[in-house]
A protein has these predicted regions:
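Generic preference for flexible, low-structure residues
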Residues: 24-29, 145, 154-157
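Secreted/periplasmic proteins that engage bacterial cell-wall peptidoglycan
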Residues: 36-154, 171, 178-183
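Short, low-order "capping/linker" segments at domain edges
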Residues: 151-164
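Short, exposed beta-strand-loop hairpins at the edges of beta-sheets
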Residues: 163-169, 177
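Secretory targeting and sorting signals
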Residues: 1-31
Length: 185
């Protein structure tokens, strides 16, 4: 590759990086610092978007939270909103239907139990979401046969009874629900 072409590519990448940084949400001086294990302790800005619903894709609020999660947990290989239909096996009030939920994976194959490395990465993602639930507007996290919810946060993780197996029991992915209209957040 020619020196001129390499300089052009370097300049193009630098310009794209600056543009992306300019468009990214910035941490405000009021950003929350959470009390959490060292593996999850970060400064997280408060989600700037209002509770909302959409017909396709993520709401702005959910997209922002998923982006913060993926920025802080780069081992996550995919976070899908699903746009699940009411007959997809989810409960009738699933946050997926309104664009306020995501399912995140760490390299493991959906539908199969993750190996120890992927399981560790998923556990770290779940811990991050719970530790930063206030500013991220997280309403619910389901992972590894357990559930954590904002309204019952003082109880910590509880047994999840909404499904079984790798998918239904949320052993192959971390589910995160973001507060929606009516949740009061």
């Amino acid at each position: 590759m020619s020196t001129l072409r390499m300089r052009f590519l370097t300049l193009s990448l630098a310009t794209a990086g600056l543009a992306a940084m300019a468009m990214a949400p910035t941490l405000s001086p009021q950003a929350a610092v959470v009390d959490a294990p060292a593996s999850t302790l970060v400064t997280v800005a408060t989600n700037p978007y209002p509770a909302d619903s959409v017909l396709t894709g993520y709401t702005q609020r959910a997209r922002w939270t998923i982006n913060v999660l993926r920025d802080n947990r780069p081992a996550l290989t995919a976070c899908n909103h699903g746009n699940y239909e009411p007959d997809s096996g989810h409960s009738s009030d699933s946050y997926h239907y309104s664009g306020n939920a995501g399912d995140c994976y760490a390299g493991n194959t959906p539908g199969q139990y993750p190996g120890p490395i992927d399981k560790d990465q998923l556990q770290r993602a779940a811990n991050f979401l719970v530790a930063n639930a206030g500013p991220l507007k997280v309403q619910q996290v389901i992972w590894n046969g357990q559930i954590w919810t904002w309204p019952r946060r003082s109880e910590g993780w509880r047994t999840y009874t909404g499904g079984t197996g790798p998918v239904g029991g949320h052993y192959d992915h971390v589910h995160v629900s973001i507060a929606r209209p009516g949740d009061g957040r």
